[in-house]
């Protein structure tokens, strides 16, 4: 009798699952199973849900994997997506607000890039609360994508942790455009393929929104390119290698001169405990950034000194235009401390080419080497207040 009862229950359960899978297959369906709630797409289970947590089940091809993951990630409700297998997708995933992606040590391979959002308004709160934990994110080409792998724009409260991102030297592993309150922690961003001697693309790009710095946004809407900068960006415990390692960008000349005003300057950028290498340009270049902290980092450019300013290890510069008023307040401080820096023309170089000087510049406790000689290891020009102390300088 017990055996017969088990058979009947199994039959009823199988019929329930079958009916749910084949009803209204144009959209995503759910059915309660022993392992939780099965979420289906195209008559196949794509995830098992427990509350707001979804355990993704890979599908048969890259396009369906991307569609299924995008369905799970869309919307504004709080959700956690667990990727528990290696996954191949055909193009970018577009997560919604309040999304956490846990990828562990699994590899997500894309025929294009991997993460993107398309903002609808020029506001830091247009997209918010995205967390990416883990994963090896790469392009299907062995030489990497000559574009952007993760592009996040007009966003706030973004956290990227323990991820590895591979990109071509001509591309960007992570591009932040007009973002606020971002943490990139314990990540590896590494370029692939061959690096030309004149390549200046960075693996971590911190951008303002202008037609030349954010052409993808300009194609979406011209209104998105109003010169909004980034603020409150923290990069810590990361290993980054590219033509350039990290760059806070500035708008071009000519028609873009209107985006070289004080309101377009990045602020409160922190780079801490990182190992950053530039192969054909600066390891770290912070342009039009009025406040920044770089500390406890190993910073090396392998660029020949004949490349002049591109061969600097750590560069901070105001470009031509109308800069912020030079003050000594904390909102206008550049602090470079306890770093090991190797450069060509200079190891550390700080200068204003704009209408105003920088505010306070602190360079202390660093070990700085320059191929051009010990006297060129550290140069700080055009600052209202300068503190240079307890540094060791060398030629290498």
What are these regions (language model features)?
Residues 76, 96-98, 122, 127, ...:
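Parallel beta-helix/beta-solenoid
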Residues 4-24:
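Sec-dependent N-terminal signal peptides of Gram-positive bacterial secreted proteins and lipoproteins
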Residues 20-36:
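Sec-dependent signal peptide cleavage junction
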């Amino acid at each position: 009798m017990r055996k017969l009862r088990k058979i009947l229950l199994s039959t009823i359960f199988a019929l329930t699952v079958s009916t749910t899978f084949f009803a209204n297959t144009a959209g995503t369906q759910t059915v309660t199973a022993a392992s939780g709630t099965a979420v289906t797409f195209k008559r196949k289970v794509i995830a098992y849900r427990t509350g707001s947590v979804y355990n993704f089940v890979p599908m048969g091809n890259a396009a369906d994997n991307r569609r299924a993951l995008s369905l799970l990630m869309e919307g504004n409700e709080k959700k956690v997506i667990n990727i528990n297998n290696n996954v191949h997708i055909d193009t970018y995933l577009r997560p919604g607000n309040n999304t956490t992606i846990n990828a562990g040590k699994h590899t997500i391979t894309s025929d294009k890039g991997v993460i993107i959002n398309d903002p609808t308004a020029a506001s830091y709160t247009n997209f918010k609360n995205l967390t990416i934990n883990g994963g090896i994110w790469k392009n299907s080409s062995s030489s990497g994508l000559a574009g952007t792998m993760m592009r996040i724009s007009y966003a706030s409260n973004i956290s990227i942790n323990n991820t590895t991102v591979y990109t071509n030297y001509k591309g960007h592993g992570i591009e932040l455009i007009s973002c606020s309150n971002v943490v990139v922690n314990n990540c590896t961003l590494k370029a692939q393929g061959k690096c030309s001697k004149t390549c200046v693309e960075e693996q971590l790009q911190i951008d303002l929104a202008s037609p030349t710095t954010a052409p993808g946004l300009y194609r979406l809407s011209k209104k998105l390119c109003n010169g909004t900068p980034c603020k409150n960006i923290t990069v810590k415990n990361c290993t980054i290698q590219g033509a350039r390692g990290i760059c806070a960008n500035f708008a071009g000349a000519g028609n873009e001169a209107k985006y070289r005003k004080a309101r377009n300057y990045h602020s409160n950028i922190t780079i801490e405990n990182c190992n950053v290498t530039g192969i054909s340009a600066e390891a770290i270049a912070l342009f039009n950034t009025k406040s920044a902290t770089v500390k406890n980092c190993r910073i090396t450019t392998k660029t020949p000194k004949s490349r002049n300013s591109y061969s600097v290890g750590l560069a901070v510069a105001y470009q031509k235009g109308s800069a912020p008023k030079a003050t000594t307040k904390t909102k206008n401080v550049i602090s470079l401390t306890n770093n090991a820096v190797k450069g060509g023309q200079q190891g550390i170089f700080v200068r204003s080419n704009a209408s105003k000087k920088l505010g306070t510049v602190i360079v202390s406790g660093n070990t700085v080497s320059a191929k051009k000689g010990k006297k060129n290891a550290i140069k700080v020009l055009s600052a209202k207040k300068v503190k240079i102390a307890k540094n060791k300088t060398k030629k290498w």
